[in-house]
Regions:
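Intrinsically disordered, low-complexity regulatory segments
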Residues: 1-142, 151, 213-214, 228, ...
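Core structural elements
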Residues: 141-151, 169, 199-201, 249-261, ...
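Structured, non-catalytic alpha/beta "coupling" segments that mediate domain-domain communication
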Residues: 17-40, 171-220, 384-434, 590
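Basic, low-complexity terminal or inter-domain segments flanking catalytic cores
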Residues: 2-7, 18, 153, 186, ...
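Short helix-coil junctions and helix-kink-helix linkers
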Residues: 261-274, 469-479
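Alpha-helical scaffold elements adjacent to nucleotide-binding pockets in ATP/GTP-utilizing enzyme cores
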Residues: 18-22, 68, 91-99, 119-123, ...
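Metal- or metallocofactor-binding catalytic centers and their adjacent structured scaffolds
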Residues: 217-255, 443
């Protein structure tokens, strides 16, 4: 009797490789490369008049893959749908089942919170049916966003500027940034003063600094007059120690990472964007080739809001801590953290799958970014099961003429978890103070020096990407799977710009936000959006019907659309010109950003008297494969985009291919993708790499060029093999051969 044939379908080749190693020859593992069905790109694809029925179509460009999967599925006895363990993954599995026409008894759903041999084999032994509540929750979110995007975007085109688009959750995120900017503008600084005295002990050696605290209770010195009055009272008088308080302070470790806290900490400590953090985490989850171990999934699933850890993971951490750091550094029992109310808790917190694989042990198998992020996750998890840090604290009050001054100091007694990991901070901690002499109540001191200083209260800081993610989580806007894309999207749409690592609204963002605030109060309302997330959670839990959620939303939204179109009839909103710090070398004015046929450029506001213009240099992600420098986006004479090293002719690298944020998992070089709309697959251009994709396999759409392009690099591009079209009527897209370093 022939052995049963088993097909396993996952999203990515790397995940397929890792799982295939665990399952063996009786299982064929293939990758769907993400979604194979989706709503159409050219139309809304949702029947608003008949129950919000979606019209799904096969994704363009994946016809051969669909055919391949259909053939493999037809030959298999069982098809295991092993996409990611969340709403999106469940929806992909459902689309696969429908697209491949799989009967219920043949399509089995399996999920892996971590891609390890134990979990993979256990999941295959215990498959389940597709969870249609999860699918419905994903469909509801997808259709909500499609309705808002397809109906609201045309209004923005007509009333503000062509090419604009609107999103449901992104609009709220933009509002948070605009609201913070308005708080900063409206902020009125308040004066206050600090007063420090350096005191010498009387009759004993030693000195210390004391800070003004108040009188009977704490009091702020509001101006210089109040400060000088205190100075007059204490000048020439002795201070007496009135209270000495010594204590032991314990500090417990932070919990293991959730999606939100991982993005925040990676932003603070590694300077990674949320989007980049999730891309690297996905690589670590799906599997990395580790020397001597083969392909291993190194972390648990990275989209989670749970703080839960399995008993097995905590036991493994306990053994590791005791063996490496000693029993005194172990917490003493499983350190269980309480997950916040409202969290879905479907998955564990983010942790390493093999705690014994410490970062240094596998560093040579990881890219720099993989190593840094893995070390962050590994250290945070291990620290969460370690003993508290212990500090000795002392607080001393001294009194003079009815005024109380306070000195404090904190010193570490036992580092505990801090030996492994310390959480980053968005704001600076209070100073721990200088060491203090051994003072007793009744000790006397005299003034050696007085220092007064004026201060002003500061406005709230602009959001960083980390603090915006934190604010979204606290307000219930978005979910772990959407934080990174939201923060990225509002920047891509140029509603928000990052300046000195902080987010500020652009003039365009403020105009769009103003329109939304006036005419779409529900869409832009934080509480309304948070409640919608709760309704989607209810759909996932089987407590609500997804079409009822859509109907309730659309009734109000449709009326807002009608009202807005009527109110804005004949109105065109003007976006203020965006002034830059670039000075026009012709007339000295500050140049402004303009939008032309081929995109944005800098122009002198003195037109028509001054007609000076300049290109805007746009930095791209990734590194030059030739010299490791930054990459810039430039425009050819015909307006086509190409990408070049920031060192220009000194390096000579240029390409029509678009650099991405991804590093090749094999060689670590920046990966590129072909230009064009939609999700393009990234590829490696390093010819020495096993992952290299030849140019003829990249699927170029050729576009005609003329001699001398791109830009000033024409001569170099021809020398490197750039081909010009044989016929002017034949569209040809030049692709420069890579530099010697990339070969």
């Amino acid at each position: 009797m022939a052995k049963p044939s088993n097909l396993v379908i996952v999203e990515s080749p790397s995940k397929a490789k890792t799982i295939g190693k665990y399952l063996g020859p009786d299982y064929t593992v293939k990758a769907s490369m993400g979604h194979l069905r989706d709503l159409p790109k050219s139309t809304m694809g949702v029947d608003l008049e008949h129950g919000f029925t979606p019209k799904y179509l096969p994704v363009s460009g994946k016809e051969d893959l669909i055919k391949e999967l259909k053939t493999a599925a037809a030959q298999a006895d069982t098809v295991y749908l092993a996409t990611d363990p969340d709403r999106e993954g469940e929806a992909i599995s459902w689309h696969l089942k429908e697209l491949l026409a799989l009967p219920d008894d043949k399509a089995r759903r399996v999920t892996f919170n971590e891609i390890t041999q134990r979990v993979v084999t256990e999941s295959i032994r215990n498959p389940r049916d597709i969870d249609y509540c999860l699918v419905d929750a994903q469909q509801a979110r997808r259709i909500l966003d499609r309705i808002v995007g397809y109906q609201l975007s045309p209004l923005l085109w007509k009333k503000i500027r062509r090419g604009l688009s609107a999103g449901r959750v992104q609009s709220v995120a933009t509002r948070l940034v605009v609201d913070r900017e308005n708080e900063i503008r409206a902020f009125v600084p308040k004066e206050y003063w600090s007063l420090d005295v350096k005191l010498d002990r009387i009759g004993k050696p030693g000195s210390f600094v004391a800070h003004y605290y108040g009188e009977d209770k704490k009091r702020e010195l509001e101006n210089e007059e109040q400060t000088d009055a205190v100075i007059r009272d204490i000048t020439g008088r002795e201070f007496t120690v009135t209270n000495v308080k010594k204590a032991e302070k314990k500090r417990s470790a932070a919990p293991p990472f959730t999606t939100s806290t991982l993005q925040q900490e990676a932003s603070r400590k590694l300077n990674m964007t949320p989007k980049r953090t999730m891309a690297i985490a996905q690589q670590l989850y799906e599997g990395v080739d580790v020397a001597g171990e083969g392909t291993l999934g190194l972390i648990t699933y990275m989209r989670t809001d749970s703080l839960r850890l399995s008993d097995e993971a905590m036991a493994a951490a306990a053994d590791f801590i005791k063996s490496r750091y000693g029993s005194s550094n172990y917490y003493g029992k499983f350190h269980v953290f309480k997950t916040k109310s409202g969290a879905q808790d479907a998955h564990e917190a983010i942790r390493p799958t093999h705690v014994e694989l410490d970062p240094e042990r596998i560093q040579s198998s990881l890219t720099k970014e993989q190593y840094k992020l893995y070390k962050l996750i590994w250290s945070r998890f291990l620290a969460s099961q370690m003993a508290n840090a212990v500090y000795d604290t002392v607080s001393i009050d001294t009194e003079c003429a009815g005024h109380v001054f306070r000195s404090s100091h904190q010193s570490m007694k036992f580092p505990g978890f801090i030996a492994v990991y310390e959480e980053g901070r968005d704001e600076e901690d209070e100073a721990v103070g200088s060491p203090l002499p051994d003072l007793q109540a009744g000790d006397r001191a005299s003034i050696a020096d007085i220092k007064k200083e004026q201060h002003f209260t500061q406005p709230p800081a602009r959001y960083t990407e980390a603090t915006l993610v934190k604010a979204m989580e606290e307000k219930g806007v978005g979910r772990p799977s959407t934080y990174a894309s939201i923060v990225s999207t509002i920047q891509d749409r140029e509603y928000v710009v990052k300046t000195d690592k902080r987010l500020a609204p652009t003039p365009l963002g403020e105009v769009v936000n103003g329109l939304m605030m006036e005419h779409f109060v529900d869409i832009i309302d934080v509480e309304f959006t948070a409640n919608m997330e709760n309704r989607l959670d209810d759909v996932e839990a089987g407590k609500r019907n997804w079409k009822d959620v859509l109907a309730d939303f659309y009734q109000g939204f449709h009326q807002e659309m009608l009202d807005a179109e009527a109110a804005l009839e004949g109105t065109r909103l003007k976006v203020p010109e965006e002034e830059t710090d670039e000075i026009c070398e012709v007339c000295g004015r500050k140049m402004v950003v303009k939008t032309g046929r081929f995109g944005k450029f800098l122009a002198c506001p003195g037109w028509p008297e001054c007609k000076n213009t300049k290109p805007i240099v746009e930095r791209m992600p990734g590194r030059c494969p030739n010299c490791g420098s930054g990459l810039l986006k430039r425009k050819s004479k015909r307006g086509y985009a190409f990408y070049a090293c920031e060192k220009g002719a000194e390096c000579g690298f240029m390409s029509w291919d678009v650099p991405t944020e991804l590093d090749c998992p094999v060689c670590g070089h920046t990966m590129f993708k072909k230009s064009g709309r939609g999700r393009q697959k990234a590829f490696c251009i390093n010819e020495k790499c096993a992952n290299f994709l030849p140019e003829d396999k990249r699927g170029y759409y050729k576009k005609k060029t003329d001699a001398g392009e791109p830009g000033e690099k024409a001569e170099q591009s021809e020398k490197k093999g750039t081909k010009k079209p044989a016929d002017r009527k034949t569209a040809a897209k030049k692709t420069a051969k890579k530099t010697e370093a990339a070969k």
